[in-house]
């Protein structure tokens, strides 16, 4: 049991701690309670983000997840052979040896970024099973106070504490560990003490989020359009407009099936992708044997140097097409919540890599003989007897490729919303077994509409490819920067390896970025415009959220004011329990006096409830609630913080109230059992009383009898309190929701007025309301409105 004075004097904090409290003497000779506890949040933090599901995972489950990986993760990477060569050589092949250079670029880019960076490094930088840029941001938030919302609590410090490495090391190892810890502490201090650095980190995170969402719109457009384009070979009468509208029809069906969930879609699509990979791998082997097996020389990286030496600036520009070979790698990371590391590595190494590399090598062998067919390299290199099966599988696999990025967008938005960086939308958990599998109806509708608009407007895979490339490489570059911070702050890797990682990946990704930005006017503006809008939405929402929180925090109601309000003669105590929802995690919100002034009555038991998301995936239900009692105790006013991880789903109102009241009764019991002992400050050794306040001069029998009497009285007292709370709950529960209207101050700048009064107001009116997010029954809902000038 831990007891302390909370913010806003007169509040007593008792967290649901160990059942065996111990005592310690402070430096002033005072007896205090000591808490020794390691809860599930502590254990999550001490893992440093290591998602080791495979350690306790059976092979049957691993193989089943590996099978689903094909249907969810690999569609985008697996369908890249449809358009990589045509986009890279959009001006034609100048020299047949250029094919060796491009194939070598594809091989080593694929190995470097997809295998080394994502499959073997980034997947291990997950946040206890969650991947993506926001998961990296939350992982950093657990090790440094980088959040812009000032709602951290001392209890969170305990839960998010990082266990120190054992001091029982060899001297040389200990010196290295000490240096790494000093370096990590320096980075931690920089992140916590520099507001510009924290803002920059946040902006990079939401930029990556915006790019991922934009990519979820562009991937379906380019994948399906490139697959449908193969119809022109067998149906020359089809024009571009007809191909575009066929693509739109397929896109509509794709987004319509998203509501069935990733779990079902994965089982449905996995056989399709497996057949597709077997087909393109087999066709690749055929082309190597039939045309030019010598292209396998491209595994020698010297052909990359020869390619750039021969083509110069043109070779640099062509990198915008080469990078399309590793599109979809971010989905491997962001969709990790649905799968395990071992299942991804297994299916990737033995299924995806051989098939895709054989497909690229086979096309290169074919184009060495028929370079004029580069505009339709994939279908032209496919044997005619396999054309129709290939076309059907290409269409199906393109749909699957789109599924990977759509799932990635859903997961990313779910994380960002939980961290207060995205407007409130409905998140549907589509699987009871895997909480990372979600579906967001509003986002699905917007993504589907945007994909159709881009397809109709662009009408060409080359234009969409340029836009697609910017999304891919920007997200990868931001991931590299965040991974570098994780290596220093969380993993505490040797600085040499950190520099190698940062230099190699940041430099190569920057070269790719400059290449795609060169063609900004030829389609690159599409994701930039979409991301700018999305960043604006997230930035406005988060900015006003932070400002509103600070406004309420600066105007918390004092203890004297609370006593005055609840002691009014005209104030009536209504039977039942009232749950007053507020964003504040400490203190009484300013809307409470407003409620008393308008409606001079409150419930017999009143709890100020804050729903708070911690930067961890899950919070154990037994550790969900923190309570404080607002003094004086006879008024039955409590503060409650309900803590969730960003992947936890909120319970419905009935279950939430039942769990809250149960924990509140435990809290009342603990206050009665330990509260008095914790408040006793015993001067040792001059005190005439022991730690229980019993005179030392009393005989042993008298002391024992007095202890028993007090124990019986305390048990009887807390039993009465528990029964009282239970009776009040049975009389009814009312949910009181503070609806604050936020406006800019009259003398604010024009920009601030536009952001707060118009942009934020529009978002707030059109997103889901708080009562729907909290699943509050309308028959038990009371809304209290108040205007804030920020």
UniProtKB/Swiss-Prot annotation:
This is Potassium transporter 22. It is found in: Membrane. NCBIfam families: kup. It comes from the Eukaryota. The chain crosses the membrane at residues 65-85, 99-119, 199-219, 237-257, 265-285, 319-339, 346-366, 386-406, 438-458, 470-490, 493-513, 520-540. GO terms for molecular function: potassium ion transmembrane transporter activity. It is a multi-pass membrane protein. One of its GO terms (cellular component) is membrane. High-affinity potassium transporter. Belongs to the HAK/KUP transporter (TC 2.A.72.3) family. The gene is HAK22. One of its GO terms (biological process) is potassium ion transport. Residues 86-98, 220-236, 286-318, 367-385, 459-469, 514-519 are extracellular. Keywords: Ion transport, Membrane, Potassium, Potassium transport, Transmembrane, Transmembrane helix, Transport. Residues 1-64, 120-198, 258-264, 340-345, 407-437, 491-492, 541-790 are cytoplasmic.
